[in-house]
Structure formats: C-alpha cells, structure tokens
Design a protein with these regions (language model features):
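ASCE RecA-like P-loop NTPase motor cores
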Residues: 1-599, 636
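Acidic, low-complexity intrinsically disordered tails
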Residues: 1-2, 439, 575, 579-650, ...
Length: 667
C-alpha cells in the first residue's frame, strides 16, 4: 500500500517550494537537508507531503513524549489509511537501578509499565517487519535505547493459512515460544485460550483478537472477532502472528547466553578476588546466580536487559539493537525541533554510562551491563540514511551538515505576521509590564513573561498576584503532562499571565497569546541567545495582534539577530499577503492535546487531589464485580485509544483492585 495524504488543505505560501526542494533532494540522494520553518507555517503538513511523494518508510524523531503525541495525532489525521505508529518509552514511572558509593546506598530499579504504550511499541515493530512500505513512526529519543534483535523477532513470527497442515499442539508450542501465555481467565493482550478445536489469540500489538479453527491436523478457518460481542469481524486466508514481546529469544540462543553469562561470572569473580574485593565477588555471585535460575525456569528475569548483549549474541562493546534496525535501509529520518533533539541524543550515552560504572565496580552487575545502553552519537549518525532536520532555529550542527544550505518556509498560509518587537528600557520594567498586561486582559488576550531566574519569576508572580493579576508560574519541576495542563488553562482563560524562566517550549501552540515579554533581554547567555529569543518571540506568532517587548538597556548581538530575522520574516509575509490579496486571519485551534485527560483538562492552582472517577467503594457481589471489571476495562481501553495514558493508568490500577477482590470472593 502507498502513503495517501488526506487533507482539505492545499500547499500554500512557501510550502510548494519547500516540498519540491526537499523531494528533489531526497531523489538526488542528498543525505542531509534542513527545513527552516517558522512557527505556524505548516511544517508538519510540508513533511506529510514529502512523505507522500517519496513513498519510503519514515521515522519522525521528537525530543519528548508530549511533542511526539502531538505529531502522532497530526500524522494520523493526514494518513488515516496507512500505518502511522507511536513509539515512546513505555514507563509511566521509572527509577533506574543505581549505587551511590559515598553513602553506600543501593537503589533498586522501580518501574510501572504502561500496557497501552507497550502495545503501540509492538505494533510499530510488527508493522516495520511486515514488509509494508507505508509505515510512518513518530518516536521520542527513547527509540535509541536497546530493544530485541530484529532477526530473532522475525524468526519467531508464526505464519499460518487456511488449509495448512499443523497440529494444534505444535501451534500452541509456537505461541508459547513467541511469549504468548495460555489463560483460562482474563483474555488480555499477549494471551491465548483453548476451547476444543478452537484457539483464540489476542496479539500483543493489536486491538482485535484472532480465532483459529482446527479440523484434525489442519487449519480449517482463521477469523478476527470482536472481543466483547464474540462476533466475527473478518475471515482471513493467511496471517502472520508477531511475538508478544520484543525481547523474544529462541531456546538455543537462550542456552548459549546462559553459558556465556556463567563464563563471564567466573572471570569477574576471579578479578574481584585478585584485587581483594571479596564482598563485591560474593555479591555478584549471588545476584547473577539468582538471575540465571530465573532465566532457566521462566526464560527471563528482573533486569534481563542487563544481559541483552548475551541474548543478542553481540561482541563486547558493540552497540545494542534499536528501533532503527527494524527499518529498511532506504528509510527517511525527520528530526523535529532538531536544535533541541540533536543535543539530547548527543547527551544520552554519557548520562547512562556513569550510573552503570558504579554498578559494575561494586559487584551489582557484570561488565556486560555496560552494553545495555543508548546509542553513542556517532552510532546514531552511522545508522542514518537520509535526514531532514526541521526547526525554526536550526543549530550550527544541522547547518554544517547541510553545508549552510537550508530550505526556507517563512510564509504562513493564514497570512499571520511575525510579532512586532519593541525594545524598552529595563528601568521601571515591572510597572510598564503591568500596564501592558492590563491592556491585553481587557482584550481577552494572554501574556507570556520570561525571566532570568526562578527567584525573579517567583517574586514577579507574588507581585502581580498582589496587583490582582491572574497569573501562574511554571518551573522546571513541573512535569510534561502538568505543563500541558497549565498551557491549556492559560488558553481557556482560567488565568491571563504565564511566568517562567524558560518558556521557549518548542511546538507550543498558544494562539491566545498576544504579548511575549522578555525581562533583562540584554543579559547574554543561554536563555538570552539569539536562538532562544527567536523561539520565545515566536510564541506570539499565532496571534493576529502578536508582539514582543524586550526590556533592555542596550541591544546585544543576540537581540540584534532576533530583531533583524523577525523583521525580515514580517516583511516577506507582508509582501506575500499584498501580492496575493491575503488578509491575516486569526488562528482558531481546538483546546486539546493527545496526552491530556480530556479535550479541556481541569487544573487547580492548589495541589488538591483530584477525585477518582468511577471508583466504587461499597461491597459488591461476585456478579457486580464482574460487571464492574468489564466496565472499567472498557473505560481503560477508551482512554488508551485517545492516548490519555494518565487516565488509562488510573483505570488499570482500579482494574487490578477489582480483579483481586473477585479472586478473594471465590476463595
């Protein structure tokens, strides 16, 4: 199947030129290209058009889960008939294993896996190995961490078809080998159940279970069915059943891995004893032997990723397999907000390694644990085929890769202009700012204020609150999902002014913001660099009255670059509007986010505990419990479909409680 773009929009402004230039570059085998696209110019739509024209599997890389979810929603809408997948870290919560030598404290790994994201990750790898060419994966940088060997994953795919000679017993053995678990109770993802000559399988990567009918030693019928009604959805001639887990391993590979682990354990114990580290030697022996016993019995153990090098049959020091290994060689990589994503990729390896070194040195892990890691930056570069960097402010790295040449997209189809920038003296800046805020509030518009330090932001929040301004302060301790909720509250008008140290959140869509105020704009540094200020000013670019005020006593080089670049973009847009008779139109954007709890999420200033929805406390009969379990599962699945993982996790926990109560009632 081919990529087929579905949209009511036609490329406009700079988009047709940008699309043609990028497509020509790909067809001419250019390895690196940069799309310099301003806020609101439709960069995602441009990339969607490029993907439709070049027709190659595509990886879109974002630097956090929230942006990945936003991009996933947009690409899913553009390509409703194609395989648009979402691949991010499946941890709701993750505390990595660590040892702090100074205090002698060992921190055990603690985590909570989001089953819905795990299903979407499996859906991604299954789609990529299916041979389909119309696969677009939106991923966070977590896709550069190690996952299972694609060859082992492919080896454990079960292919069946109608009329095939296959015993029921052999088929069940194949399912177990592919990490499906037989069940007689709840029929969940990664389970199969047997009723006479019929075997039901619930793939780990799909919403739709499969039913296989046997007649003797022959497959008589294959069909998909509705889990709730049990009705047939579709009859299938043939089917590939992909493993229920990415870390699937063949029995012969598992045995070879166990032998290698034992050999390395002996060597490391001998090393520790030779340098007088008897405590470390004893600790490593006990921990590793316990893990080996678990692997022999169950095929896995807690922390099995630390043995991934053995299971992947990789030499010491080699890079792990990652999502990119599942793509064909001719894939396209799009790095969104590249000025932020590339540095994040560059920093991943170092942070992981320092933690692992302590675990190995003090006998908590074998040295092979060091090879369970994210890619080094040079390994990431070596895996690239063709890359498009996308940013409103490309960094030197991207421009150097492209020889200083970039594709420009500064015209907005809506006709909206870049904000006007004013420079005002820093003396009496707070009084002046208060006046400007009051003007915006009267027009039902919002304001962003960026300060240099947390303390300044806190003091300004207190002062404005005292002056009866409805304001909030956002800081680095606020997690991603809560930050999105705060942004939504700003858009809804629950408060008027958002204050923070670093508000240049890439991809932030806030059409209601008409004023961005930058305090102490002349204090050179990371937060007042040309790139940072251009991003910050751009937050007002989606409002028809958008403007920015820089409070400063002198104009720095960074300020000058930002002012000149913004003026150039304004002029270009004005000329385009004049030539084509376009009147700038205000942007009306629905207040929602793929990760939010609802289209408009409630957020309270005080940290009041939110009421748990659908949380029964009264004693229930067995029948009532079963009904409640069914209803809760439906709510969990509905939340998951909307990518509302917080709410889905709440229903998941509630479901576990109800299932435990049901089990107790049957004793």
């Amino acid at each position: 199947m081919k990529f087929q773009l579905v949209s009511d929009f036609k490329p406009m402004g700079d988009q047709p030129t940008a699309i043609a230039s990028l497509v020509n570059g790909i067809n001419d085998q250019e390895k690196y290209q940069t799309l310099l696209g301003v806020t609101g110019s439709g960069k995602t739509f441009t990339i969607a058009n490029v993907v439709e024209q070049v027709q190659v599997p595509t990886l879109v890389l974002a630097h956090n889960k929230t942006l990945a979810a936003q991009l996933y929603s947009e690409f899913k809408a553009f390509f409703p008939n194609n395989a648009v997948e979402y691949f991010v870290s499946y941890y709701d919560y993750y505390q990595p294993e660590a040892y702090i030598p100074v205090t002698g404290v060992y921190i055990e790994k603690d985590l909570s896996i989001n089953e819905d994201i795990e299903r979407m990750r499996l859906s991604t790898t299954s789609a990529l190995l299916s041979g389909r060419r119309d696969v677009l994966v939106v991923a966070s940088v977590s896709c550069l961490y190690g996952i299972g060997n694609p060859l082992e994953f492919q080896k454990n795919v079960i292919s069946i078809e109608e009329g095939q000679t296959l015993t029921r017993t052999k088929f069940m053995h194949q399912l177990v080998q592919s990490l499906y678990a037989r069940t007689t109770a709840d029929f969940l993802h990664g389970n199969f159940r047997v009723k006479g000559d019929v075997i039901d399988i619930f793939p780990g990567y799909s919403e739709t279970p499969i039913r296989v009918h046997f007649f003797g030693n022959e497959i008589e019928l294959i069909e998909s069915f509705d889990r709730e009604t049990n009705k047939t959805i579709e009859r299938l001639d043939k089917l590939n059943i992909y493993p229920a887990n990415m870390f699937v391993t063949s029995p012969d590979v598992l045995q070879a891995a166990i032998r290698d682990i034992q050999d390395d354990l002996v060597k490391q114990i001998e090393f520790f004893q030779s340098v007088g580290k008897t405590l470390e030697a004893k600790r490593l022996e006990e921990r590793t032997n316990f893990d080996l016993e678990m692997i022999r019995e169950l095929g896995y153990c807690s922390g099995i990723e630390n043995y991934s090098r053995y299971l992947d049959r990789r030499p010491p020091g080699s890079r792990p397999f990652c999502l990119i290994d599942y793509f064909p060689k001719d894939f396209l990589m799009v790095i969104d907000e590249s000025h932020a994503t590339v540095p994040q990729v560059r920093a991943m390896y170092g942070g992981d390694r320092s933690r692992k070194e302590n675990l190995v040195e003090y006998g908590f892990r074998l040295p092979a644990a060091m090879d369970n890691r994210p890619l080094k930056f040079e390994e990431f570069e070596a895996l690239q085929n063709q890359v498009i960097y996308v940013s409103a402010t490309p960094a030197d790295y991207e421009l150097q890769k492209c020889g200083g040449v970039y594709v420009e997209q500064v015209i907005r189809p809506t006709g909206l202009l870049d904000p006007k920038i004013e420079v005002r003296p820093s003396k009496n800046q707070i009084d002046d700012l208060l006046e400007e805020i009051q003007k915006c509030v009267e027009e039902d518009q919002r304001v962003l204020v960026t300060t240099l330090t947390k303390r300044m932001a806190e003091e300004l929040t207190k002062y404005l609150t005292k002056m009866e301004v409805r304001c909030r302060y956002v800081h680095s301790d606020v997690d991603t999902l809560e930050r999105i909720e705060i942004m939504q509250d700003l858009r809804k008008g629950l408060f008027d002014v958002l204050i923070g140290v670093n508000l240049l959140r890439e991809g932030l869509d806030l059409p209601e913001v008409s004023l961005v105020a930058i305090l102490d704009a002349d204090k050179e540094g990371f937060l007042r660099s040309a790139r940072s200020m251009t991003q910050t000013v751009g937050r007002a670019a989606r409002n028809i009255d958008g403007r920015a005020i820089m409070y400063a006593d002198k104009i720095t080089d960074s300020m000058r670059v930002t002012i000149e670049e913004t003026a150039y973009r304004r002029e270009k847009q004005m000329n385009y509007n004049l030539t084509h008779g376009i009147t700038p139109q205000p942007l009306h954007k629905k207040i929602e986010n793929a990760l939010s709890k609802s289209p408009i999420t409630e957020f309270h200033y005080e940290n009041t505990p939110k009421k748990k929805e659908h949380s029964p406390t009264k004693p229930m009969s067995r029948g009532e419990l079963e009904k409640e379990i069914q209803q809760t599962r439906k709510l969990m699945e509905a939340a998951s479909k909307e990518l509302d993982f917080i709410q889905a996790a709440h229903y998941r926990d509630l479901l576990k409680e109800l299932q435990e109560k049901l089990q107790e009632s049957s004793l």
